[in-house]
Amino acid sequence: QRQMCIETGAAFPDRKIHLFDTFEGFSEKDITIEASGNLSRAKTGDFSSTDIDSVLHVMPDPTRTVIHKGWFPDTFSDVTDETFCFVSLDADLYAPTAAALPLFYERLATGGVLLIHDVYSTQFSGCRKAVGEFCLKNHLFADPVCDLHGSAMIENYKKKRRNRYLPEPAFLF
């Protein structure tokens, strides 16, 4: 994640970077959903070791970093007027991923990219389920990314001219 912060800051040197995190790990509510669907072995509080100061310390320019602490999507109300050119979504679990996808995609600039971590991860199949449902509902395609996290990316095709010879986008299962 440190390297991702550095590279994102370098790629967008003149933009604000919004970071959404609970800084408390996974919630009991989300873990209950994961367990009922046999989607992961995650536990309440996993990933709770992240703190705001350590995150700001690795950001190339902390003055351009906006922290949104709390449970997603509740914290999204702070940015309803924003348009995003790049979103890196690493929610891991089904419920927060399913809640985040439509909110961010709706505000993604034309040609913007939504990068979702753990889509092809064997550790968090709830993320894959959420992305699959979102792509099928919206006729989108999640392109696999060759990384260690099983990531995929969705490009915003709104208003963008599509090649009429390409097949309709879908999600790879």
Give the residues covered by each predicted segment.
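Short, small-residue-biased leader/transition segments that mark boundaries at the very start
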Residues: 1-5
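A short helix-to-beta-strand connector/capping loop
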Residues: 15, 60-66, 138-140
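Conserved SAM-binding motif I beta-strand of class I
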Residues: 17-20
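A short beta-to-alpha transition loop/helix N-cap that caps and shapes the active-site region
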Residues: 24-31
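S-adenosyl-L-methionine
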Residues: 31-80
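Active-site segment flanking the S-adenosylmethionine/decSAM binding pocket
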Residues: 65-124
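Conserved Class I S-adenosyl-L-methionine
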Residues: 128-147
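Positively charged N-terminal leader segments that act as targeting/secretion signals
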Residues: 158-172
